[in-house]
Structures are given as C-alpha cells and as structure tokens.
Amino acid sequence: MKKNIIAILTYITLIPLSFSQNTLSKYLVDKETKAPLKSATIHNANDYTVTNDDGHFVFYSSNDSVTIKMLGYETLKTTFKALSRTKDTLYLIPKPFQLDEVTLSNKNIIQEAYNHASTNYPMEPFVEDFFLRCILKRNGELVKIEDFSGRIKRDKLLGAEKNFTFQLLNMRKFGIEKKGVRADDFNIPSLNDVFQWWSNILFLNQENYHFSRPKTIDEQHQKIEYTPKSEDDYQKSIGYFIINTDDYAIKERIYKTNPKTIHKIPYTKKPFIKYRTIDYYCKDKLEKDAKKGKYFIANAIVNVKVEGYVGEERIVYDVSFELIVTHPFSDLSTFKANVNGKKELFKLDVPYNKEFWETQNQLPLTNEMRDFINKPHNPKEYRVISNF
C-alpha cells in the first residue's frame, strides 16, 4: 500500500524568562464553587498569559500591575507586590447575572460587530509573540508532540492572504512514524495554514446562518448563538459569539461541528484508504491592547477528529492546537524571519534549547507526554523523530 497522507487545516501560555522581571505562580478558582477557571486572562500593559486546565498560571513581567479577568466574573486589578503576600489560590467572584434570564432587543449586534471591524482590529502591519502547542494522537495514543515559541508578522489581523512571515525562537518536538510502504500517516499543516485559518473565519456570512436574540452575560457583554439556515448542510458549523456592547468587538467565539449532520459528512477516498473529519471544535478569545486600542486573538484552541479506514481497519486521528499571544504588538524593527511558513510543522528544523525548555515553566510536559517520550519504541516498526 502506498503511503497516504491525510492533511487538514486545523494553546498554556508562556513568556520567556528574562532578568529583572516579576514572577507570579498561582491557581485561579471560582469563589463560590471552588472550580478551577480555565482560560482566564492575566495581563498588564506589556504582557499576557492565561490559565491552564487546572486554573494554574505563571506570569512574568517587568511591569508591577496585574489584571485578572474572565467573562462572567468581577475583574481583579492588583500588583505583583500585593499578590506575593497571598496564598497560592486566588478567587474570582461571579457577577450577579444569569446568562439566560435577560433577552434584549432585536438590534442587529452581529451587523454592528461587522461594521466596527476596521476600527476594532489592526489593519496595518504588526508583530505578535506567540506560543503554539500541537498534539497528534492515533487511536487515542500520542504519536507527535510539538511546542513552539516565536513571532509572526502580518499585514493585518483579519482577511490576510497568507502574507505571514515567521521568526521561530524555540522548538521542542518528539514523534514516531510507522516504517514501510504500508504505513498510513497524518500530515500536520504549516504555520501559514494555521494562522490563515485564525485570520479568516472570525466572521460568518449572515446569509447562511440564523442568529439568536442577544442574551446578557454581564453589563458589557452579550451572547448570540448561531445555527445554519440549512439543517442538512454538514459544511456549516454551530456556535456562538460573545460581543462587547461598548465597542461591538467580538470577545469570544465558538465554532464547532453540528452533531446532527455528522452522518452526512462524506469520505474522501484514495487508493486503499478513505477518511473524513467527524468533529471540529474551535474557541477564540480576544483581548484589547491598552496601548494600541486594538483587539487581538489572545488565545485560541482547535481540536479536530479525523476518521479513516485502511481496508477494514478503522483509524481515528485527534489533532489539537493551542495558541497564546504573549505580546500582541511587539517591536516590529527587531523582527527577523527565519523559517519557511509553508513547510509542514513537524518538518521544521529549529535547534532544541534545553535551558529554555527546562526553565520556562509555562508549557509543561504532562505525565502522558513524558511516558510517551520515555517509552521504548520498536525501531523495526517506528522511526523516532526528535530534536532533543
């Protein structure tokens, strides 16, 4: 069987350590339920980070101020100095609003968000510092892990035409590939592909979707759900927008596969193999930079499940991307492109910096990842690919 490549377009934080910076490591939970708060934003005028699945974050900055916020909760404004005297766990207070209690007017808030796009989002060249994690699983088992720290330069945030250039600063990768011509494989997309997707589908064609009446989240945010007008259209997603009613900026978006149409998704057929995407989930969170007055995608998550058959054997691939932007408008003059953005992610070659990865504390390897890396892999069956 010929080698077949399944290609699809399909975030944990970190800020590089530097001298004379303040350091903060805490857990963030709901004050009432004590549940960990995932993807809450911690920032000041210079730096950004977010909490992980356990509500944990590590924040570095030379600026003493700290703002901690999450939709539906009271914002906490404090300092590194003040937080250094607190316990390891911080509590956010839920705002006294119920999501489904208040339904507002018929004003087309979606159209207002579209009308304000050119003022809310950067429309001129800018550079962002980012971290990106990619994980690939085959039938529930890890096969590839890749972490990046780097910078991206683009002409504008939305509607870009793959006019990206990249400066990768650090990379850590480990993976296995089956040997032999009967091997099936999964081709992870390029940096261009990943950022192209995040740049181009923040907005939807209103002609193709039904939008719900807006519902109040808090005094500044409304939620609008959407569904495709054609219930049988498997190519259209379901999801929601959360929009700031002060400036009509999109603050959060969910875009996912409609479970009612999965059975309609056809297979792509090639010699000896057929495959299809059976689940897709994307979540974008945007923040406003205080200095520039523009919004940027601070945190994005993409999870994709691909089902394939090699003969009678069913294979399920799960690929996930996690992105966080730590410096949304960094120094344009210091940007130096050093990699080909069109090259498949796992084929990029950047030397491993042991000191960086062992001290950054922001993209830690999970126990599952460590077990995968340390596990003996049969050299007759697998080819190990690693830069460390």
Task: Show the residue positions of the predicted features.
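Bacterial Sec-dependent N-terminal signal peptides
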Residues: 1-27, 388
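Short, ordered, surface-exposed loop/turn motifs in non-cytosolic proteins
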Residues: 24, 31-45
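A short, amphipathic beta-strand motif
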Residues: 24-31, 55, 90
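Short Pro-Gly-centered beta-turn/loop motif in secreted/extracellular proteins
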Residues: 34-37, 58-65
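A short, solvent-exposed loop/turn motif at the edges and junctions
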Residues: 44, 68-78
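Short, acidic Ser/Thr/Gly-rich low-complexity loop/linker segments typical of extracellular
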Residues: 47-56
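Surface-exposed, low-complexity/disordered segments
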Residues: 88-220, 270-388
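Extended beta-strand-rich segments in extracellular/periplasmic secretory proteins, especially
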Residues: 198-257, 290
